[in-house]
């Protein structure tokens, strides 16, 4: 069990006692042992079935409408320290409120918005604790929270990473890498449909001197061809041993069908051909009968 409550994060808390309404005996939740924070209420609607004093429960702690710590077993879409793509639920004279999967929406003050947020639109934001108010808030000015020391972190060329697509630019798409670093996928490296807010795997193609990362959506070089060889072989098996595309097909047709570059397609096709798994003809590719 944790001794210090981490607001906006998951905490393993012990059930101290059942919360009863004074004078009525009505149960309205559990009081969790918050250590130095004192008792933290878990409302009855979040209490796991059969929970009793002495049990330990993994719960998310945030502030309720009256700014009191509250424990829940709900799973938020993001926690403090995370970048996330969230929908604006409503706005008032102080800022916008984003749906992050909890009963109380996440506040994004006007000063943390790049442009005025509108109801129904989605935004990439960073979730953090406001130092002045000690409230959990969101910021759309995500650049302030990204690190520029990817090289020191040991990220290397062709390393697989997790990315969140952040913003479209003239060069391609900006991405947040491993929830920490800025990255860029150049337009000529994109071989499938990509949208702001998408989460996917990517590969480091270059670690730049400024600490930013160039990315690609496929493994580099032979690794990409080897991965796609298996995809192409399975496609042939699933389509009566035939593919209308070949080494003379246009990059656009290959991209549309398989979401890879023509270079990767040709390398994979060559690998299958050298291993006598396929036959290349004028009208396409044929799976060898014994395959």
What are these regions, as identified by a protein language model?
Residues 1-291:
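Single-stranded RNA-binding regions, centering on S1/OB-family and related RNA-binding modules
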């Amino acid at each position: 069990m944790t001794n210090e409550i981490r607001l906006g994060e998951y905490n393993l808390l012990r059930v101290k006692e059942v919360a009863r309404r004074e004078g009525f005996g009505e149960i309205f939740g559990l009081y969790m042992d918050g250590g130095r924070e004192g008792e933290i209420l878990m409302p009855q609607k979040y209490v796991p079935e059969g929970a009793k004093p002495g049990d330990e429960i993994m719960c998310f702690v945030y502030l309720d409408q009256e700014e009191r710590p509250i424990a829940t077993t709900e799973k938020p879409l993001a926690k403090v320290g995370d970048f996330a793509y969230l929908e604006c639920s409503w706005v008032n004279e102080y800022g916008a409120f984003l749906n992050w999967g909890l009963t109380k929406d996440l506040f994004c003050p006007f000063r943390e918005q790049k442009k005025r947020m509108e109801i129904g639109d989605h935004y990439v934001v960073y979730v953090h604790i406001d130092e002045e108010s000690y409230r959990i808030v969101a910021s759309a000015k995500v650049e302030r929270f990204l690190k520029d020391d990817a090289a020191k972190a040991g990220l290397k060329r062709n390393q697989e990473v997790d990315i969140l697509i952040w913003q479209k630019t003239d060069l391609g798409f900006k991405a947040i890498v491993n929830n920490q670093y800025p990255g860029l996928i150049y337009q000529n490296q994109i071989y499938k449909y990509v949208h702001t807010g998408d989460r996917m795997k990517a590969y480091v193609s270059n670690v730049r001197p400024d600490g930013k990362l160039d990315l690609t959506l496929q493994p580099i070089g032979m690794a990409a061809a080897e991965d796609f060889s298996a995809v192409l072989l399975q496609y042939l098996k699933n389509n009566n041993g035939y593919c209308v595309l070949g080494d003379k097909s246009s990059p656009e047709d290959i991209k549309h069908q398989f979401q890879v570059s023509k270079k990767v397609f040709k390398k994979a096709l060559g690998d299958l051909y050298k291993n006598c798994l396929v036959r290349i003809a004028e009208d396409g590719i044929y799976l060898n009968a014994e395959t």
